[in-house]
């Protein structure tokens, strides 16, 4: 009677606070919507969440591109280079690419311990936005297959906004 049934879906909209010092134009307190599905590994729920985001932005009349990535693809950069210990620093550096230059990200990658050639290899990989070209490690191949499944599920769903693969997206890790 008092047990949660799975998969469990939830969402909430509430005030949240930044722990760090807010940058210019940002507030310490702001509203955020979180949506989660727990208790299932089915990719159907990933597609369902993409459909939900699409509906919300349609209702708000805000055209967007919904970006999608897979943790296994991000992990594969470090694993391919045999540097699994640098997964988080590599991912953090890549996630800055929408805000800073490629040269600065290359410097950040070298600061965390990658060689110039290793940093260059990663940056060359992410220039390619075609999902089929990310089969350079068994981990990335799993991520590619999972994302292809999600894109296949979304193909006939009538989305209003475009869902795209973005290999540098790493928010929330």
Residue positions per predicted region:
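Short C-terminal domain-edge/linker segments immediately following a structured domain
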Residues: 41-45, 67, 96-99
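Beta-rich nucleic-acid/ligand-interaction surfaces
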Residues: 68-80, 169-173
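Acidic, His- and aromatic-enriched active-site or binding-groove loops in soluble protein domains
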Residues: 82-111, 159
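Detector for methionine-enriched segments
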Residues: 50-52, 79, 86
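Positively charged, Gly/Ser-enriched RNA/tRNA-binding surfaces
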Residues: 1-63, 105-173
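Internal, well-ordered alpha-helical segments in soluble enzyme and binding-protein domains
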Residues: 49, 70-73, 90-93, 105, ...
